[in-house]
Amino acid sequence: MLNSFKLSLQYILPKLWLTRLAGWGASKRAGWLTKLVIDLFVKYYKVDMKEAQKPDTASYRTFNEFFVRPLRDEVRPIDTDPNVLVMPADGVISQLGKIEEDKILQAKGHNYSLEALLAGNYLMADLFRNGTFVTTYLSPRDYHRVHMPCNGILREMIYVPGDLFSVNHLTAQNVPNLFARNERVICLFDTEFGPMAQILVGATIVGSIETVWAGTITPPREGIIKRWTWPAGENDDSVALLKGQEMGRFKLGSTVINLFAPGKVNLVEQLESLSVTKIGQPLAVSTETFVTPDAEPAPLPAEEIEAEHDASPLVDDKKDQV
């Protein structure tokens, strides 16, 4: 009964206005009131402040500063094996496994479309059909910066407007096509392990999604798909990130979805749904034994990137950001 009521609220409540209100409040400097809210949050969610670079809650001027607090370097050591891809976020694995052609598992008995997740871009989807996916849920108590599983060179970023449903276990089991419906930022990288997508999914009360190379992607929420591309290889204009390096952050809540090409990686055997994740711990292992740190990522051809753009029925060329 209670779960049915919670689900009903997901459809009834004005999620966009709640999210805007939360974002506004979380960015305000309110002195003692800010500290009180942070202290109550820490107590309620049992946040481990000993891991933070600034463990004193009085040192945060806004709730957002607290929420995206950096951790001490030593608390999240990065696995240095060049054959190992590491976890991109602190949280819990919602689902993981093989992408069955165009189907990704959302929850037991519920699938959603790979192509829909990628905003109808069937050529980008072709890179990952029958590949591997991992969905990581970040709870309110978790560290909310997102890091790189491996070295990567950014090739494309797409902002997809959408709903703002919560992305917890209850909604994943009951809201059809949840991750393909919600607002999200799709980041496509060239890596030593083939193409990799890292997708930051928004949710109710998620005030903003940011990346280290472009800053705040949303808000504003303009209701249009936006797209940016970068050249292949390392050059003055490229965005090259190292394994374990921060790539983005959420200001409140949400989910990260990783997509890997078929035949390139094997997920760590011990991982399963509801496994706890910590940044830097092993997530997957290369199917090729002798990957070196200096291996050159295989770039996607420029014409393929452009073809992906043309293939997406949801993109308005006049409004693209290239």
From Swiss-Prot:
GO terms for molecular function: phosphatidylserine decarboxylase activity. Binds 1 pyruvoyl group covalently per subunit. Its cofactor is pyruvate. Residues 293-322 are annotated as: Disordered. The modification Pyruvic acid (Ser) is found at S254. Is synthesized initially as an inactive proenzyme. Formation of the active enzyme involves a self-maturation process in which the active site pyruvoyl group is generated from an internal serine residue via an autocatalytic post-translational modification. Two non-identical subunits are generated from the proenzyme in this reaction, and the pyruvate is formed at the N-terminus of the alpha chain, which is derived from the carboxyl end of the proenzyme. The keyword Hydrolase does not apply. Residues 308-322 have a biased composition (Basic and acidic residues). The record marks G253, S254 as: Cleavage (non-hydrolytic). This is Phosphatidylserine decarboxylase proenzyme. The gene is psd.
